[in-house]
């Protein structure tokens, strides 16, 4: 089984690559495979037998609120070039995002198909929304929608690492937000690879929902940290949670949020 992972140098892509070692995984850097160049990508698929594409490459993730059209066009161009070469592989797994939705409103327990009722204002979100629409109408294309993800190897800039390392943490909007532990993404990817997945759009979320403060306090308990370092601002912000029914229906053996946070020790 030959797998191409785009964006394999980023946090999500590199994690997935490390945990699919039982397969023959291609992880080209940007200078080795230019996703913006249709001819380059077409040539790659001519010269390599690829079964699965896992699309993790993105643009604009660092500037989520930007409306710069460059981030919109870049995100769509990369995906368009992969889509145009769909005859060169069997399946594509897209790492989607809850930012496919309009985050200026509350998004609680959103279902997989709800994104069609949204057109995000941000370039990153709109790009991801359009990609999700194309995937919905393309056979053998899958969208795994990640709301938030975490792992003990993540950057110190991420929320849970800040809770551990910083002397004071301010939660401006204490909303309910879904996070998934990165190891729990792998079983669903393998389910798709093995042909055992009956759904092509899946919210990667757990059934139980937590506020940011609840997760921060939980982590403080596990790490023996002083909870008083946490300051909560607004508790009435917009939530960002998904319906877990489809993911739960597969009865995958998942580690879960609580044990994932324990693993930061």
Predicted regions and their residues:
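NAD(P)-cofactor binding segment of oxidoreductase domains
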Residues: 52, 66-93
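NAD(P)-dependent short-chain dehydrogenase/reductase
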Residues: 121, 133-177, 182-184, 191
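NAD(P)H-binding glycine-rich loop region in Rossmannoid oxidoreductase-like domains
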Residues: 35-74
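Conserved Rossmann-fold NAD(P)-dependent oxidoreductase catalytic core, especially the SDR/UDP-sugar
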Residues: 80-121
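Conserved C-terminal active-site "lid" loop/helix of NAD(P)H-dependent oxidoreductases
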Residues: 44, 182, 211-217, 231-265
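Substrate-binding strand-loop-helix patch
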Residues: 150-154, 174-186, 202-221, 255
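Mid/C-terminal beta-alpha module of Rossmann-like enzyme folds, strongest
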Residues: 163, 167, 188-191, 195-238, ...
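N-terminal Rossmann NAD(P)H-binding glycine-rich loop of SDR-like oxidoreductase domains
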Residues: 1-21
């Amino acid at each position: 089984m030959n797998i191409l992972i785009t964006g394999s140098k980023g946090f999500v892509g590199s994690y997935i690559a490390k945990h699919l070692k039982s397969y023959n995984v291609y992880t080209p850097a940007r200078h080795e495979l230019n996703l913006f160049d249709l001819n380059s990508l077409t040539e790659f698929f001519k010269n390599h037998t690829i079964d699965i594409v896992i699309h993790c490459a993105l643009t604009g993730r660092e500037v989520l609120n930007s409306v710069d059209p460059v981030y919109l066009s870049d995100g769509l161009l990369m995906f368009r070039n992969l889509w145009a070469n769909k005859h060169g592989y069997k399946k594509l797994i897209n790492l989607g995002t809850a930012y496919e939705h309009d985050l200026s409103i509350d998004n609680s327990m959103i279902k997989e198909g709800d994104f069609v009722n949204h057109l995000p204002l941000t370039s990153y979100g709109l790009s991801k929304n359009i990609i999700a629409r194309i995937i919905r109408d393309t056979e053998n294309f899958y969208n795994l929608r990640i709301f938030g993800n975490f792992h003990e190897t993540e950057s110190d800039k991420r929320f849970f690492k800040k809770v551990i390392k910083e002397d004071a943490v301010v939660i401006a909007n204490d909303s309910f937000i879904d996070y998934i532990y990165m190891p729990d993404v792998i079983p669903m990817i393998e389910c798709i690879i093995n042909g055992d997945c009956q759904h092509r759009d899946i919210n990667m979320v757990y059934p139980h929902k937590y506020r940011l403060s609840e997760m921060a306090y939980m982590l403080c308990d596990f790490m023996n940290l002083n909870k008083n370092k946490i300051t909560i601002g607004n508790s009435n912000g917009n939530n960002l949670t998904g319906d877990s029914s489809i993911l739960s229906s597969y009865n995958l053996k998942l580690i879960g949020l609580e044990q994932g946070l324990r693993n930061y020790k």
